[in-house]
From Swiss-Prot:
InterPro entries: SH. The keyword Methyltransferase does not apply. It comes from the Viruses. This is Small hydrophobic protein. One of its GO terms (cellular component) is membrane. Interacts with host TNFRSF1A, RIPK1 and IRAK1; these interactions interfere with host NF-kappa-B activation at the level of receptor complexes. Interacts with host protein UBQLN4. Its main location: virion. It is a single-pass membrane protein. GO terms for biological process: symbiont-mediated suppression of host NF-kappaB cascade. Plays a role in the inhibition of the host NF-kappa-B pathway. This inhibition occurs at the receptor level, by preventing the signaling of TNFR1 as well as IL-1R and TLR3. Residues 1-8 are virion surface.
Length: 57
């Protein structure tokens, strides 16, 4: 039943749009979290590095 199947370019276009939306959403979340982490890292940098070294050993 080829009539029910959507055209190949339409499927490709939808997948591309979905990929772009997900990428933009993830990039926005990561950017906000990164900026927040950088903002607080200046206050807790020594605690974070000390905890990181303790956990790695």
């Amino acid at each position: 039943m080829p009539a029910i199947q959507p055209p190949l370019y339409l499927t490709f276009l939808l997948l591309t749009l979905l990929y772009l939306i997900i990428t933009l959403y993830v990039w926005t979340i990561l950017t906000i979290n990164h900026n927040t982490a950088v903002r607080y890292a200046a206050l807790y940098q020594r605690s974070f590095s000390r905890w990181g070294f303790d956990q790695s050993l």
